[in-house]
Amino acid sequence: MIVIHSVAQMQQYARDKRGEIALVPTMGYLHEGHASLMVEARKRAKYVVASIFVNPTQFGVNEDLDSYPRDLEHDKEIAAKAGVDVIFAPIAAEMYPEGYQSYLNVEEISAHLCGASRPGHFRGVTTVVAKLFNIVAPKVALFGKKDFQQLAVLRRMVQDFNFDLEIVGMPIVREADGLAMSSRNTKLSPVEREKALCLSRSIAAAKAAFRGGERSVAALQKVAAAVIEGEKSPQIDYLEFRDQDSLLPLDKADERTLLALAVRVGSVRLIDNSILGED
């Protein structure tokens, strides 16, 4: 496995391996969820590139850019075990050199859920991912479904801008107690870590009510919210039932309905989601 920091060097590698690369974009501080993407990437292409870049343009004012966990040596160990050929780890000045002024925005699908509470977030995501696609030239790129809206936004971007690649969404990987794996979990105190289980428990409660015959979104929202509110300190950013394709709101739920939520536990904002009809 090699580590590349230069855009020019990464582009040269990509030219030599064109049509044979799978890309796993990450912000680093890798965990088993990331590793599962890399293992799957290994099955889909001759060469696997994992990008590690804490992208400043997707963080808003007073968000956790400066405190986002970073450990390249740790990341190299996990990536190597997962079969990665190249880590592309540029610095911000490589991706956004002096005078940089071009951004890409997907309008409607990015405007709600995380986009409503994090203005500019998805503009930063789509811009950096489009740049990675141009630099690495993958035939396939893999993303986790924990960031369900991000996946939907990127699918729309790929379609609208005619990127010649496949986007693959992979299932959420969870800890043994149900918490969705996230690099931000390491920022939780032991007490906060226990409280964070309210996200997966609220999903389980809503799905149980759905299996019991409840189809009213308003009623299902009350069931799910009650679990989180019962923990007192966690703060709900959003808890929504949406069409999984358009992400538009619904009045009645069915098996394809997406339950997506964002909850702040202490200073840490966590997200989770599930499709009501899936186990």
From Swiss-Prot:
Active site residues of this protein: H34
Residues annotated to bind ATP: 27-34, 144-147, 173, 181-184
Catalyzed chemical reaction(s): (R)-pantoate + beta-alanine + ATP = (R)-pantothenate + AMP + diphosphate + H(+)
Single GO cellular component term: cytosol
Family matches, as Gene3D superfamilies: HUPs, Pantoate-beta-alanine ligase, C-terminal domain
Pfam families recorded: Pantoate_ligase
GO molecular function: ATP binding; pantoate-beta-alanine ligase activity
EC primary class: ligase
InterPro entries documented for this protein: Pantoate_ligase, Pantoate_ligase_C, Rossmann-like_a/b/a_fold
Residues annotated for beta-alanine binding in this entry: Q58
Chain residues that bind (R)-pantoate: Q58, Q150
Protein role: Catalyzes the condensation of pantoate with beta-alanine in an ATP-dependent reaction via a pantoyl-adenylate intermediate.
Subunit-structure text: Homodimer.
Additional note from the record: The reaction proceeds by a bi uni uni bi ping pong mechanism.
PANTHER family, per database record: CYTIDYLATE KINASE/PANTOATE-BETA-ALANINE LIGASE, PANTOATE--BETA-ALANINE LIGASE
Name of the protein in its database record: Pantothenate synthetase
Source organism of this protein record: Citrifermentans bemidjiense (strain ATCC BAA-1014 / DSM 16622 / JCM 12645 / Bem)
Lineage of the species this protein comes from: Bacteria, Pseudomonadati, Thermodesulfobacteriota, Desulfuromonadia, Geobacterales
